[in-house]
């Protein structure tokens, strides 16, 4: 009976011209699966400028894993590593990460596509300001949509993996999760469903809210100590004598920095490490810092008990000792630039010197320059000190102008091209919807204590409060964790992460089934219309 129905459908297609994309998904494969291509890679000729074909193309690298693929018409699990070279993120093809785990559940293939200007996917031979003009949000989104619509995947000789014939599920984390959300908003109906973990969808210039989840989740003794330390630093740098300022800089090994805002920024930087902590970690620099400030022997401080009144001078001395012995040594030298060589060199923290080699490093391997371009141009999200009405663990000497000054030095005007032309956080949020995203078949997850949560749909700073979950846009807030914890299978040791992953995978599985149902309905309706016409 099944064979008869299949032959009947194919005959209808051949005789009556039934569109190829209305064939049901779960029919037997017409072309056998090529088992020699369980994994591999390819090169896609991508448009440099999607609005001007004359600019040409570049080779965009992609990788695939068909270990769990059910054959032609089965789901495609799509992933991009965003601001990283793909060769450093190939584990996302496997079931040690969420994309591979979803593929295993729904019998899908994982396809990983490298982001333009990262890794091997380079439109030009250097990263000059003029060459970077094609690195824009709309070009990036168009890349992935164009890939999905036109790629010939080498493991599917039948062509049944086109998004109109198979459900493409885009899974993203962090920046790539924002791309997931923005694609669903701006170019819908190409990908069938979306999973966005830790998506920072609302752009802000003075992103002081970044550190709020850190303050809520970190050991509270450490929080109050850091708040007191940063308050003291700001007080000295804003109103202290020249001798007091120099003495404080020297205490932290930063006497070679000329600018006070650079020094204050350097002293604030270690708290950013909070966002890197995963539930499966057995050691974290952030807790090492907290242990040092509190003069604790433990290397893994997770307590939240509030202790006695802060002894500022003791905490300041402990922080200075940790900063100069554990954090600072080798920090600049590790960059590899000769003008930043030396174990105790601190010049990489100087953002105002246009002569630094890093500011003129146009090599395509310089991922920092590419990401700086995107931050300076589109996303902003500069981590700054909190308003004076709030306690802060990040210096108030660091504001958006501090970052803009650096952007101007890194990207001078060239061939009438400059950074951030007519782009503001308001204009980006108007385009994308910001944290007021309402979509279809898109699932958001965020960690309760993820600093990036403050720019997400689950932000407590969102005017209407954290967005509520709906059937078409489920939102999961994972208790007690930081950034993108649900992307890694090793984090399933945490009960809340495990439950979030299971819920998310179950939702994606239902949406995959919905795709088959919708396609079957389309075929039935089309066939009925044909018979009625005859």
UniProtKB/Swiss-Prot annotation:
Quote the pathway field.
Mycotoxin biosynthesis
EC numbers listed for it are 3.4.-.-
Mind listing the GO biological process terms from this record? Answer: proteolysis
Q: Which GO terms describe its molecular function?
A: dipeptidyl-peptidase activity; serine-type exopeptidase activity
**Glycosylation site positions:** 65, 126, 297, 416, 436
One matching Pfam family:
Peptidase_S28
* Top-level lineage group: Eukaryota
Q: Is Secreted a UniProt keyword of this protein?
A: no
State the family named in the UniProt similarity comment for this chain: Belongs to the peptidase S28 family.
The protein's name is Serine protease vicPa
Leader peptide range in chain numbering: 1-17
Top EC class for this record: hydrolase
Q: Which PANTHER family match?
A: PROTEASE S28 PRO-X CARBOXYPEPTIDASE-RELATED, SERINE PEPTIDASE
- The residues annotated as the active site are 174, 450
| Function, as annotated | Serine protease, part of the gene cluster that mediates the biosynthesis of the secondary metabolite victorin, the molecular basis for Victoria blight of oats. Within the pathway, vicPa and vicPb are probably involved in the processing of the vicA1 and vicA2 precursors. The pathway starts with the processing of the precursor vicA1 by several endopeptidases including kexin proteases as well as the cluster-specific S28 family peptidases vicPa and vicPb to produce 7 identical copies of the hexapeptide Gly-Leu-Lys-Leu-Ala-Phe.
- Which UniProt key words apply to this protein? Glycoprotein, Hydrolase, Protease, Serine protease, Signal, Virulence
The answer to whether keyword Glycoprotein applies is yes
């Amino acid at each position: 009976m099944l064979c008869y129905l299949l032959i009947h459908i194919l005959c209808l297609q051949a005789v009556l011209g039934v569109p190829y994309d209305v064939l049901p998904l779960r029919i037997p494969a017409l072309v056998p699966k090529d088992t020699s291509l369980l994994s591999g890679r390819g090169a896609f000729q991508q448009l440099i400028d999607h609005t001007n074909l004359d600019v040409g193309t570049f080779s965009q690298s992609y990788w695939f894993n068909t270990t769990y693929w059910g054959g032609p018409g089965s789901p495609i699990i799509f992933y991009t590593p965003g601001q990283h070279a793909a060769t450093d993120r190939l584990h996302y093809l496997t079931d040690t990460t969420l994309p591979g785990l979803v593929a295993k559940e729904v019998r899908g293939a994982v396809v990983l596509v490298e982001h333009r200007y990262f890794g091997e996917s380079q439109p030009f031979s250097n990263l000059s300001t003029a060459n970077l003009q094609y690195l824009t949000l709309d070009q990036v989104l168009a890349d992935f949509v164009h890939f999905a619509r036109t790629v010939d995947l080498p493991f599917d000789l039948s062509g049944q993996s086109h998004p109109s014939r198979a459900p493409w599920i885009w899974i993203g984390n962090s920046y790539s999760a924002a791309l997931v959300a923005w694609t669903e908003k701006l170019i819908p109906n190409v990908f069938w469903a979306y999973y966005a973990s830790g998506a920072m969808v609302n752009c802000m210039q003075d992103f002081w809210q970044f550190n709020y989840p850190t303050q809520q989740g970190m050991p509270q003794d450490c929080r109050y100590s850091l708040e007191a330390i940063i308050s003291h630093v700001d007080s000295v740098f804003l109103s202290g004598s020249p001798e007091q300022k120099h003495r404080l800089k020297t205490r932290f090994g930063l006497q070679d920095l000329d600018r006070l805002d650079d020094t204050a920024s350097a002293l604030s930087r270690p708290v950013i490490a909070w966002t890197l902590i995963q539930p499966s970690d057995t050691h974290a620099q952030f807790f090492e810092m907290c242990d040092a400030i509190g003069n604790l022997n433990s290397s893994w401080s997770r307590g939240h008990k509030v202790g006695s009144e802060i002894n500022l001078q003791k905490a300041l001395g402990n922080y200075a000792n940790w900063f100069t012995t554990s954090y600072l040594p080798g920090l600049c030298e590790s960059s590899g630039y000769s003008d930043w060589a030396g174990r105790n060199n601190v010049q990489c923290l100087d953002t105002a010197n246009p002569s630094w080699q890093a500011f003129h490093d146009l090599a395509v391997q310089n991922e920092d320059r590419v990401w700086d371009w995107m931050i300076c141009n589109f996303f902003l999200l500069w981590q700054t000190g909190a308003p004076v009405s709030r306690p802060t663990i990040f210096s108030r000497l660091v504001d958006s102008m501090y970052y803009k000054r650096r952007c101007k030095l890194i990207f001078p005007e060239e061939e009438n091209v400059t950074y951030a032309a007519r782009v503001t956080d308001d204009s980006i949020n108007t385009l994308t919807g910001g944290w007021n995203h309402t979509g279809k078949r898109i699932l958001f997850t965020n960690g309760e204590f993820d600093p990036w949560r403050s720019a997400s749909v689950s932000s407590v700073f969102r005017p209407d409060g954290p967005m509520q979950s709906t059937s078409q846009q489920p939102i999961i807030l994972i208790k007690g964790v930081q950034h993108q914890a649900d992307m890694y299978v090793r984090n399933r040791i945490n009960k809340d992460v495990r439950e979030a992953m299971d819920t998310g995978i179950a939702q994606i599985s239902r949406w995959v089934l919905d795709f088959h149902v919708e396609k079957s309905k389309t075929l039935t309706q089309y066939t009925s219309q044909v018979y009625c016409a005859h």
